[in-house]
Structures are given as structure tokens and as C-alpha cells.
Amino acid sequence: MQFFKDILNGSDLFDGEWYKETYPDVARLGMDSAEHYLKYGWRMLRDPSTEFSTKFYLKFNSDVKSAGVNPLIHYITQGVNEG
């Protein structure tokens, strides 16, 4: 989990403060923003920032969706190089 949290936190496409402000239930849970997005948020089609649309990415990358892969992690580690 820490490996993937580090990937998110090192990316301009993940904004932990924005995530907590946009989804106040995360703050109420006292959960780390990156951990929430990794475990639950992307499955709830929540966006990790204003710069990345989870729903859009999954819509146009059905292989990622059907594989159950976190869309932002996929984009950062593979998708950005796929074009």
C-alpha cells in the first residue's frame, strides 16, 4: 500500500487536500486521502484532483476497468506512455 501511496503523493494528478475538501466523508473518517482513493475512492468513481477524471479514464480504457486496476496508478505507471 505504501508504494502506491508514494506514487500518488508524488504526482501532480493527486491532490490530497482537494480530495478531502471535495469528499468530506474522508476527513470525517480520519483516513489518509491517498489510502482512501486507493482502497475505495476510485471504485466510487471519485476524482483524485481537478486534473484527472476517474470516470473518463475508465470509460476510454475498458481493459483497465475490467482488470480492476486503479485508473490513476495505471495512468501514472503505464498509460501516460501508451499515448
Regions found by a protein language model. Give the residues of each.
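Charge-rich, low-complexity intrinsically disordered regions
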Residues: 1-83
